[in-house]
Regions:
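Glycine-rich phosphate/adenosyl-contacting loop at the front of the ribokinase-like
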Residues: 1-78, 250-252
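Conserved N-terminal subdomain of the carbohydrate kinase-like
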Residues: 52-136, 307-311
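Conserved beta-alpha-beta core of the PfkB/ribokinase-like small-molecule kinase fold
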Residues: 131, 137-214, 231-233
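Conserved phosphate-binding/catalytic region of the ribokinase-like
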Residues: 1-12, 154-158, 205, 209-311
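Short, conserved phosphate/pyrophosphate- and ester-handling motifs at nucleotide-, phospho-/glycolipid
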Residues: 46, 196, 258
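Proline-centered loop/turn at the N-terminus of a beta-strand
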Residues: 10, 52, 162, 192, ...
Length: 311
């Protein structure tokens, strides 16, 4: 089943979408149903900034899969490349809030997205895009999904399509040594790398901002956007690097903020911004997304971001 097929998307994202249950407050037994999955969050964030986006994945032939497809339809995300797998379920995860921040628990083994394989890839759609976005989770959820992600990257590069990669390291999904090896293989074929501070220090063993971006740039990317949370982002190209300050808000939940940054950043690059302009915009979008609960509901519109930037 395929639905919602506007003009060819400029931005495609490949990965797993999930149903989210987010604790309503610290210590509370109530969980609010929402939506997640890093690359899906990314797609929605980019779409809310006005970009033409599409998602490449699989969902189960179940109620949760239908909810996700309905979500993408509402968000103007192209679902032409979303498969419905009648033999698998849609993944679910829980977000709990405590004194040390938020914690995640996943029910995703054998999910429809984890069964995705190279033969499922929409090669023509990938070749027609301007950017394809993947993450460490795209690579980690299963061996077949990893093979599909790496093949998608190779096909994109062979057709002049830029590759965007967010590290999103999840050690519950795979051991650190394998994560390092596979992610470095992906980064070598990446044009735009979007690591978080915690991920990249764990992956590289480095702790200096400049040595981290030197390491990443030496492996292939032309743009590194190192996410620094409330402090903004450190943007580096082979010719220039600088901190782009964050936007200060009263944050209540940072779930998905990095995905929001990535979607907004890539949307602005596709529209013609340079990396530093794109980061200024994306920092505001990510900050605004922390003012509500969940990975999707608080993602701001383009109008909301532009209002802050204009002020």
């Amino acid at each position: 089943m395929t639905v919602n097929t506007p003009a060819n998307p400029d931005i495609l994202a490949l990965g797993e979408a999930m149903i989210e249950f987010n604790q309503s407050a610290k210590g509370e037994p109530k969980y609010l149903q929402g939506f997640g999955g890093d690359t899906s969050n990314f797609c929605i964030a980019a779409a809310r900034q006005g970009a033409r986006t599409g998602f490449v994945s699989a969902v189960g032939a179940d109620h949760f899969g239908r909810l996700l497809i309905d979500l993408w339809e509402r968000e103007n995300v192209d679902t032409a490349q979303v498969r419905v797998d009648p033999q698998a379920s849609t993944g679910v995860y829980f977000v709990s809030h405590g004194p040390d921040g938020h914690a995640f628990d996943y029910l995703r083994a054998g999910s429809a997205a984890s069964r995705y394989a190279p033969h499922d890839l929409p090669l023509d759609a990938i070749a027609a895009a301007k950017v394809i976005h993947l993450s460490g989770i795209s690579l980690a959820i299963s061996l077949s999904a990893c093979d599909a992600a790496l093949e998608a990257i190779a096909h994109a590069r062979a057709n002049g399509v830029r590759v965007s990669f967010d590290t999103n390291l999840r050690l519950k999904l795979w051991p650190l040594n394998r994560a390092r090896a596979v992610m470095l293989e992906a980064i070598r074929q990446t044009d735009i790398c979007l690591p978080s501070w915690d991920d990249v220090t764990e992956l590289t063993g480095l702790t200096g901002r400049d040595e981290i971006v030197d390491f990443l740039l030496s492996h292939g990317p032309r743009v590194v956007a190192l996410k620094l949370g409330k402090d903004g982002s450190y943007i580096a190209t082979p010719d220039e690097r600088r901190v782009v300050p964050g936007h200060v808000v009263n944050a209540v939940d940072a779930t998905g903020a990095g995905d929001c940054f990535g979607g907004a950043f890539i949307a602005r690059l596709v529209e013609g911004d340079d990396p530093f302009e794109a980061a200024r915009y994306a920092n505001v979008a990510a900050a605004l997304s922390t003012q509500g609960y969940g990975a999707v509901a608080p993602v701001p519109s383009r109008a909301a971001v532009e209002e802050i930037l204009a002020g």
